[in-house]
Amino acid sequence: MSSIYIGVYKALYDYAAQAEEELNIKQNDLLYLLEKSDIDDWWKVKKRVVATGEEIVDEPSGLVPSTYIEEAPVIKTATALYDYDKQTEEELSFNENDKFNVFDLNDPDWILVGDLAKEKFGFVPSNYIQLDSTAEPAQHQQQQPQQVFQPPPQQQQAIPQQQTQIPINNFPPPPTHKDRTPDFPAPPAHRDRSPEHPPPTPEKDYPRMFEQEPRSLGSRYDRQPEGREEEEDEAPPPMPSRPTGSNIVAPEPVVGRSNTYEQEENVEHSEHSYDGEFFTWYIDEVDGRKKRAIKLSIGQGLVIIKPNTTNPKKLRMRSSSSLDNQWRIKDLITFNNEKKHVFLEFKNPAASLELHAGSKDVAEAIMAILGDLKGAEAAHGLREVAKASKASANERNRKIGRLLYDFEVQGDDELDCKEGDEVYIIDQKKSKDWWMVENIATRRQGVVPSTYIEIISTSNLDKLTDGPLRRKSTKSKGRVVETKDKRSSHHRTREERDRIREKDRAQRDKAPTSQTEQDKSMPNFHRVRTWIDSSGTFKVEAEFLGCVEGKIHLHKTNGVKIAVAADKLSVEDLEYVERVTGTSLEQYKEQVMKQQAKRAKSKSKSGATATPSSTNETKYASSATAAINDIAPPKPTRPQTTTQVSNNGAPLYDWFDFFLECGVDIGNCQRYTLNFEREQMDENILEDISPSLLRTLGLREGDIIRVMKYLDAKFDRKKTPEAPQQNGGLFIDKNGNLKNNSSSTEISKVSADALPSPVKTQVTSFTPVNESTQNNNKIEDDAWAMKPAARSSEDLLKPSPQPQTPQYTGALSDLVNIKPVGTSNENKAKTEQIPVEPSAPALQPMKTSNTAATSSIPPQGPGVTPQRTGTLVPVQKTGGLVPVQRTGAGLVPVQTGGYLPAQPTGFVPITAQPTGFIPIQATGILQPQLTFGIVPLQTGTSTFNANNKTAPPRPDTAPPPITTFGQQPTFQPAFVPLQTGVITMPQTTFGGQSQQLPTQITGGAPPQTSFNQPALVPTQRTGGQITGGFVPQSNFGKQITGGFMDTNTLSFGQQITGNAQQQPPPSTSFGQQITGGLPATSFGQQITGGFPQTSFGQQMTGGAPQTSFGQHITGGNMPNTSFGQPFSQQATSNPFPQMANQFTQQQQYQQQQPVMNQFQQQPQQQQQPFYNQFQSQPNLNQMTNMFQNTSISSPATFNQQIPTTTFGQQPQFEGFGSQPLQSQPTGMGFGNAPLQSQPTGKRANLQAATPDNPFGF
């Protein structure tokens, strides 16, 4: 990219623009030629304008007559020092050693030049070129007459002014060129600052004239390379920023440059001062190839370096000058100079600085001041030598400490000291916190807190006497250091390291730069230090490279790089790494201190000279840190016993050694030691240590055995076997035999408190209960052992009519409230109370069912018999569905019976005896379903025969069922018989329960509806729905899930499964529909459906009950939803009595599919009477098995006993029965899986309930 300028010209005359496109110019203005016209003599130029300060100016451009301008004279030639690529179109790109003609030096940062071929013109950085002394200056002199011939008036005045200023030293020179050299080219404006606040470009404030003596310029540049020949190959300096310009016309800054050199020679006079406390110099810091102005102050034992600029852009360099830094004079490790350069190396913090003093005199002055202060600071060493020479023999090994803070006496044995007092350390082992010391000046002795003392030296001359040995050891790296005192050895190695550094520094300074740069494989000798291992045995001279993951990386003087574990180095080395990296290594320092303390103790035991522990050494360092804070640390508590405990609670007992002696792996000793010290344990508790204590403190089992063996041997203890537990464990008894946690006596899940008083009497009479109570009141080790639950009675299997009746009622209530088999006694009590209020109806139905059961099994209480019998058997025996239904009614109220859904009664059994329910439901359901199914429906009706519409035959049943059936007839005229059958069933159940149905209606109006629905073709519906009807019937289908849930009859609908679960609280089932719920559950698609819903699916069969009840029950009972799609809605909405209406409505609803039709959807089911259908479905038998209703298999029985049919369907229950309640499909319908476990043929007796027999069958 070529330059936009095609020439540099100078105005010969003034010209005033006469048009907008023309440009005003003055004589001697510098112009950049932009365009030449081939048509006329008007050329386009741009006027050069130099900005002043931060001013931003625009350089105007326009047309001027070509006769008013001429080419600008070349005032100097220059040579490129580095390659440069231009950044803007006004600049020039060039390569190293390119030659240029210089036209203007007015800008100290950017020089206006052109190539020798005069083809390219532009600006180049001033610190990238070097001006040459050539013939151009002579040419410049020849041009001067011309310049004087027509000078502008202001220039005439400026000439004498400049001449008078030539000898002035403070004339501001251009910043860049004076100090620019190939080695340290500095950004312009560096050298032109005044002693206090240098302006970046001071020469801009003065007009420059070409008339100035050119020789001075040449001499200034000619001298430059002399001092820095070795730096010619340096990399290029940073780019200067482009100037903003100034209106000053005169471009000649030559005079200022010559004066700059003179100023450099006098820099020590003009740029340093002394205010009585500090010597101050304004010099430069060199960081690589960059230099920054700094202010160096030395005095008061400090060396302070601060940046010397107010321009934030000057602080870009990341070096010591970018921030204030301060070191104590004693932290100055080495200092030397070479010509104008001063080299300093500090510690705390570590830093290596290179300063450019500007002149050799200034560098020597800085060296002299540093030498005086460093010597004065080291003078205390001479005083220590004098004191050591006077010390007596017994004081040879004493340490000398200095007080960091004032200490006031608070005890008789304490020593009053002031800050700065020096004392002998007499005894520092007796207590870590209080040291016995002797004041060197007063010879008084006493104890002083160890944190107030800083160890500074020793009272002997080991440093002098051990010198030859130390020098010998340094020549063999890694050889054992022969020394008696690790501390003195430590000091020796530090001094030796200092001398080695000084020697290496001198060699490095003398060596050529190129040689040093070539030796990249060797460490930086300026950073080499001596590293000593924690034992003081080995040492190595190496440079620190870094610390990573607990490894200290070092570069040895032989060029080998190594990584040393942090816990293997001395504490001082770790502190050095902490200072350099700013990373905490406390965890490693603690390990080193422990190891050193252990070694010191072992040496003292063996008779070796006791060496100071690393713990104390670290305390010195800690004290030094506290000294920086200038805050006295808290005074430790005075020891009261011979066992000294530090302020942090750590006992003096060496647990580490203890564990080693016990045979514990050394890798675990430290962790165990920390745990014991954290708990403030000392040797006094050794005899009390037990395995449980060790286990609590984190010891491993193997180590626990080792420690206990060691303690037993130490205290001559004989281990006695632990006495066996008196009460045995969780699975064993006192004799060690396996416990039989299952009791021969059935355990009641109902607490004695929840049972009626007669039962309570029985409960209290039981010894097992008392034992359990007594055990519960004991606080023994076997508190977690399995214990038998409180038993209500040993004779639970022996039912007594009176107790059983309330129990039965209570069971019903419990079933209503019980979700899982076991509920709290309180809930059961509440449950008992709740049903007791309506117990008249509930009990009577139950009694009725009991009566039915009684007819089958008189000895047992009416309620119990059906349950125990497995409802099916009793129901079947009853032959009359009525009894069964009544039983169901008893459980749920009659509706259940009437419906098998009515099996709410079954429901009760569900809780008490699900089996009872199932049979009841099965019977009721099957027949209705069978009847509905086809002819069987009628047959079923006959069976129910209550049958038939003759709801009248069974007045009791008629009312509730009538409603139900009423709806059913409406539902499907074809099913009139079925309805009758249904009616019959309900009648049977309802027989005595019609009233209960209302109750059920209340409890679960839906259930009644379901009854109605069952009465309706629900059975068939169920059948139809069983497959599609069931689900299809939105109610049912939905109910299966939702409807059911409403009814709480899980049985219904798909619910059977879902609802059953949902109804886990039988109470829910009952709750919503004690009657309805039950029926719904049992029957409503439930019996089968309830359990598996399959019955629904298969339904008729499995759900004969489901069938009839199935959809109906579900629909009517549960949610009506089931049945209804039709029934469910209406049935639910209407009470039982309304069932008829609902049924009618549902008829329409079911018109979607009359029950028959729905059944027809399942042709097989419709084709087959419910009975047949049930039979067709193997579930029927299964159901029978579930319910254990023999009658299930036989349709007649089925008819007679809805349970049978229900059972037929029960196969699905079986699915339900897969749960423990299988025997009680009804219970399953309700979702009380636990009931299944009870046999159908048995009576429920909650007092005799056990985990295996929750209903006490």
Swiss-Prot record:
In the UniProt entry, what is the domain comment? Answer: The N-terminal SH3 domains are important for actin cytoskeleton assembly but not for localization.
Cell compartments where the protein resides? Nucleus; Cell membrane; Endosome membrane; Cytoplasm, Cytoskeleton, Actin patch
Single Gene Ontology MF annotation: identical protein binding
Its job: Component of the PAN1 actin cytoskeleton-regulatory complex required for the internalization of endosomes during actin-coupled endocytosis. The complex links the site of endocytosis to the cell membrane-associated actin cytoskeleton. Required for assembly of the cortical actin cytoskeleton and for hyphal growth.
Classification of source organism: Eukaryota, Fungi, Dikarya, Ascomycota, Saccharomycotina
**Stretches assigned to the SH3 domain:** 4-74, 75-134, 396-458
**Keyword ATP-binding among UniProt keywords:** no
Q: Which family does it belong to?
A: Belongs to the SLA1 family.
Species source reads Candida albicans (strain SC5314 / ATCC MYA-2876) (Yeast)
Any matching Pfam family: SHD1
Q: Where is the composition biased (Polar residues)?
A: 846-858, 1057-1075, 1082-1111, 1117-1135
What name does this protein carry? Actin cytoskeleton-regulatory complex protein SLA1
Query: Biased composition, Basic and acidic residues: where in the chain?
Result: 189-227, 493-511
Q: Which SMART domains match?
A: SH3
Swiss-Prot/TrEMBL induction comment: Expression is regulated by NRG1 and MIG1.
